[in-house]
A protein has these predicted regions:
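C-terminal amphipathic alpha-helical interaction region
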Residues: 1-121
Length: 121
């Protein structure tokens, strides 16, 4: 279903197609990352940074939802539809890009959280 939304967005053209391309790239990034993380065999390190993974994945899901709404709103007059498009613009300009640093952190297999010791509190 997500790929159907991306395909519709790409076919629609304009800024909706740009957003569809951004979403497609983010989906690819998280899919590649997931394979890398589980392939690393370092499950303790991977799970120590689970909150960053969940946040990135959640942003990608929300981008999909905003893309669906933008596809429905594009070309329709009225404040309601313009508001939907502006909200999608905001999300794709400011929120979806946050997945890049999260994915980079996850890819680095950072041990900061895992290496914390209880007696250091």
């Amino acid at each position: 279903r997500v790929q159907d939304t991306v395909d519709r967005g790409l076919a629609q053209g304009g800024e909706v197609a740009d957003w569809a391309g951004q979403l497609s790239a983010a989906i690819n990034d998280i899919a590649v990352l997931t394979a890398e993380l589980w392939g690393s065999g370092q499950f303790d390190v991977v799970l120590a940074n689970a909150s960053a993974y969940l946040e990135a994945f959640g942003h990608i899901v929300l981008a999909w939802i905003w893309l669906e709404q933008a596809e429905a709103a594009a070309g329709n007059p009225g404040d309601f539809y313009q508001g939907k498009l502006q909200a999608a613009r905001y999300f794709f300009a400011t929120e979806l890009p946050k997945t890049g640093p999260q994915i980079a952190l996850l890819r680095s297999l950072d041990r900061t959280s895992l290496d914390m010791q209880a007696n250091w509190f």
